[in-house]
Each structure stands twice: as structure tokens, then as C-alpha cells.
């Protein structure tokens, strides 16, 4: 792009000069649109920053010969957040030496640094508190061991001084983390699987299958209002979804193994979807009494319906899938006692998750849902992956723009879902008690443990 902008082709006369000016304008317009659309992603790329500086330098050089480019210069200046105002007169040949020093001093303090961007990103920390369960803690990526340990201690009601934080690396090595150790790298890779232990390295709590106290936790869930739970789930999801940029879907699909931290919000929402599904399973399977288990299933059906009403299809899918997993759906004695009216409601909700005809039921319902709304992201990613893998990016050494247009149309759905032209609004006021519970989900992620609990509740005949 730089050679295209800089090329003068030794033009002669007015027509050639106008042609060069038009070409420069076209390049600057393209760069401005590109930078405006993908600003946050581009600002973290050192190559892009260097390119933008170089282009701006060339533009400043051209101001004397093409003073009508001053509007484009101001637009680019705003994008770079330069504090100093440059004018065409300032870049005349007589002031070239002084100009050069200013050209090379684009105000770096106007550009967010990688560290600043990193420190404002959020992650879901999975902190294992037993062999088969973890506590989910939403935190900044800049969190240190002491800060995370303090949050976990408060949630578990265990004195902080009794706990330590371990990171278990891929080879199985256990690292004892110091209070000020950072838990995430610049690319948001965790130092390892995080475990909270007592100082003698014993477990903080027994496994769920042997923990009588944890098996009484259903009482807390049963006391909560279903609408409040749905509101809290939606507020959490919306706060993340509203920060998802459509470019994240492209990074996730095209360069999943080298995203460089560019898919943080998207991965957070996908992680949350999986977490909510596990939470539904955990709550039902940790309830030892039949009558309470029936009440829990009734509550989750209502919460799923409320999430749908609140236009949160991501949480809606997660709850329905959680109730439909083999470990929960096999509890025939429990499902038999669910009232017929609620069974009918659940059947209608299930129909929306039916994958037949390429999820036609969901797509039709979602199309009719007003914005803002949260889509079921795994399906959206599946659509993009299908386009990407089913079509070549290059045909006869030329870019396949038809493929790129199809991907663009699909990812543009993110922006559409985030729009709120009618003032419908997504976040609502939630109960502090419910928020404290839902924002820190304690779930079992071990499928063997979940099935063991299921068969313990209703043994195979």
C-alpha cells in the first residue's frame, strides 16, 4: 500500500497530477476506513503502528505539493490521536528539517500500549478447589496470585492465611505461586491449571461425591427468584458480548492458534456458555432429595424461558443443553414428577435447539427477535468455519472476494445484535444476593464424576 501511495510515476501535466492526487486520496480513504473499523486490534500490532507512522510521514511530505490533502491529514491525525496540529505551510521545503523531527515524533502517549490494553481485559479464572470442581472467578487479566486467592477465600469462607495458590503445568509440575506473580501472559495464556490448597498442600474441600455439606447447596438455589437469576445471567453475558468485535470471529476462525489475545471477549463468552451448562448439571446432580431435584428442574426450565424472553439465546441454549445431557436426562424418576405444563414448555424450548435443517427453528426465531440480542455463538462460529473451510481463499492467484463477502455478511451479525436503535436495552437491575451466587459459579467439570453422581441418585435398573 505504501508504494501505491508514494508512486508518482513521473507524471507530467495537470491530468497526471490529478490522477496521482486521486490515487493518494483513495489509499488514505481505505486506510481511514480500515483503521476506524479495527482500531483496537490494529493499535496492538507493531507492524501496523509502523505502517501508520510511515504513511503519515509521507502524507506530511505531500502537503506542500498537494495542499488539498489537508482534510485527509486531519482525519489520519485524529485516528493517531496526535496532539500537535500540523499545517501545509509547516511542511514547505524551507521547513523540511524541522518538519522531519515532528514527523518522527508521533505522540506515542496517544496510543494505548499493549500493557494498558491487557490490563483492561477480563478473563474467567477456573480455580480448582477440589479434584473434580472449580470456582469460576471473573477477573482482570492483570490479576496477581494474591488478588485471586483473596477472592476465592471470601467465596469459600476460609481464612486467607490458610491458603496457597498452585499452578499445575502441562507436564504435571506443581508451581507454588508467590503473592505478586502474574497469572496470565500478554497473550492471556494462564501459567497453568490453577489450584487452591491449604498450606500443607491438602485439598480445601473433599471431592463433591464425598462432600455432604455441598450436597445441601440446592436449598440456596431453590430460594432464588427465577427471573432474577435470568437477569443476572443476561447482565453477565451482555457485558461481555457488548465488547465482542466482529473481527474476533475472523481471528478465531482463521488463526485460532495465534490469536495474540485478539479473541478475548469471544472466548470468554464461549467459556461462559460451557460453564453455565456444567452449572445446570452440577446443581441438579448435587441435589440428593427427589422433591428438591424436581423443583430445581422446574426452576431451570423457567430460567431458560426467561433468558429467551430477555433475548439471551447464548444462556438459553446452555441451560437447555445442560438439562438435555445424558447424566441429567436419564433421571427418569425425577422427570416423571415434573408437571405436564412445564414439560410442554420445555418441549417447546427444546424445539428451538433442534439441529435439524441446519438449525432452522432457531434461525427463524432469532431473525424475528428484536435487538439488542445475544446469539448462540457456537452456531455462528460454525457458519463462519463452514464458509472458510468450504471455499478457497485464493483462486488462480487472485483473492476470492465472494468468500470474504460471505464471511463479512456473517460476522456483521455481531454488530447488528449489539444495536439498540429502539432503546430496548439489555442490562437490568439484578439482586445482589443472586449476583454474588451466579457470578461465581462452583461447578463440576469432570464427566465421570457427573455420571457417578447421576447413577448414585437413580441407579441403573
Give residue spans per PLM region.
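Residues within HEAT/ARM-like alpha-solenoid scaffolds
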Residues: 15-29, 43-50, 67-74, 143, ...
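Alpha-helical solenoid scaffolds in large eukaryotic transport, assembly, and signaling factors
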Residues: 1-47, 136, 160, 228, ...
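Intrinsically disordered, Pro/Ser/Thr-rich cytosolic linker and juxtamembrane tail regions that serve as
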Residues: 66-268, 272-274, 279-286
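Residue-level signature of the C-terminal ends
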Residues: 4, 33-41, 45, 58, ...
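Intrinsically disordered, low-complexity regions enriched in proline, serine, glycine
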Residues: 1, 12, 38-46, 68, ...
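Interface signal in eukaryotic adaptor modules for cytoskeleton, membrane trafficking
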Residues: 2-31, 165-180, 184, 332, ...
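Alpha-helical scaffold repeats of the Armadillo/HEAT/TPR superfamily
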Residues: 3-5, 45-60, 75, 170-172, ...
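Intrinsically disordered, proline- and charge-rich regulatory regions
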Residues: 22, 61-125, 150-151, 161, ...
Amino acid at each position: 500500500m505504501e508504494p501505491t501511495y508514494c508512486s508518482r510515476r513521473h507524471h507530467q501535466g495537470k491530468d497526471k497530477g490529478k490522477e496521482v492526487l486521486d490515487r493518494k486520496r483513495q489509499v488514505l480513504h481505505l486506510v481511514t476506513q480500515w483503521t476506524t473499523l479495527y482500531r483496537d486490534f490494529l493499535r496492538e500490532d507493531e507492524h501496523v503502528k509502523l505502517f501508520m507512522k510511515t504513511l503519515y510521514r509521507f502524507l506530511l511530505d505531500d502537503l506542500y505539493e498537494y495542499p488539498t490533502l489537508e482534510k485527509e491529514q486531519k482525519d489520519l491525525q485524529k485516528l493517531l490521536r496526535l496532539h500537535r496540529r500540523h499545517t501545509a505551510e509547516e511542511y514547505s521545503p524551507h521547513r523540511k528539517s524541522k518538519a522531519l523531527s515532528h514527523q518522527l515524533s508521533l505522540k506515542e502517549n496517544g496510543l494505548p500500549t499493549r500493557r494498558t490494553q491487557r490490563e483492561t481485559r477480563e478473563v474467567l479464572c477456573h480455580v480448582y478447589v477440589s479434584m473434580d470442581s472449580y470456582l469460576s472467578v471473573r477477573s482482570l487479566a492483570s490479576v496477581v496470585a494474591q488478588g485471586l486467592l483473596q477472592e476465592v477465600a471470601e467465596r469459600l469462607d476460609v481464612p486467607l492465611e490458610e491458603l496457597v495458590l498452585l499452578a499445575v503445568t502441562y507436564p504435571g509440575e506443581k508451581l507454588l505461586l508467590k503473592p505478586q506473580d502474574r497469572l496470565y501472559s500478554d497473550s492471556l495464556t494462564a501459567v497453568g491449571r490453577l489450584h487452591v490448597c491449604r498450606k500443607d498442600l491438602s485439598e480445601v474441600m473433599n471431592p463433591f461425591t464425598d462432600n455432604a455439606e455441598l450436597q445441601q447447596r440446592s436449598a440456596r438455589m431453590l430460594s432464588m427468584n427465577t427471573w432474577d437469576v435470568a437477569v443476572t445471567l443476561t447482565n453477565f453475558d451482555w457485558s461481555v458480548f457488548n465488547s465482542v468485535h466482529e473481527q474476533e470471529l475472523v481471528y478465531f476462525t482463521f488463526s485460532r492458534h495465534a490469536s495474540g489475545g485478539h479473541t478475548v471477549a469471544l472466548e470468554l463468552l464461549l467459556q461462559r456458555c460451557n460453564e453455565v451448562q456444567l452449572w445446570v448439571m452440577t446443581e441438579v446432580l448435587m441435589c440428593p432429595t427427589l422433591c428438591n431435584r424436581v423443583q430445581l428442574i422446574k426452576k431451570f426450565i423457567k430460567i431458560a424461558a426467561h433468558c429467551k424472553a430477555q433475548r439471551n439465546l447464548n444462556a438459553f441454549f446452555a441451560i437447555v443443553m445442560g438439562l438435555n445431557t445424558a447424566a441429567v436426562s436419564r433421571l427418569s424418576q425425577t422427570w416423571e414428577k415434573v408437571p405436564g405444563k412445564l414439560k410442554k414448555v420445555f418441549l417447546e424450548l427444546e424445539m428451538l435447539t433442534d439441529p435439524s435443517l441446519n438449525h432452522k427453528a432457531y434461525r427463524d426465531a432469532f431473525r424475528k427477535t428484536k435487538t439488542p440480542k445475544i446469539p448462540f455463538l457456537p452456531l455462528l462460529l460454525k457458519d463462519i468455519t463452514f464458509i472458510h473451510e468450504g471455499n478457497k481463499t485464493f483462486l488462480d492467484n487472485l483473492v476470492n472476494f465472494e468468500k470474504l463477502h460471505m464471511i463479512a455478511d456473517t460476522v456483521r451479525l455481531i454488530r447488528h445484535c449489539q444495536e439498540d436503535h429502539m432503546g430496548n436495552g439489555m442490562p437490568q437491575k439484578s439482586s445482589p444476593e443472586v449476583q454474588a451466587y451466579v457470578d461465581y459459579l462452583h461447578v463440576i467439570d469432570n464427566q465421570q464424576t457427573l455420571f457417578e453422581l447421576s447413577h448414585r441418585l437413580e441407579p441403573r435398573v
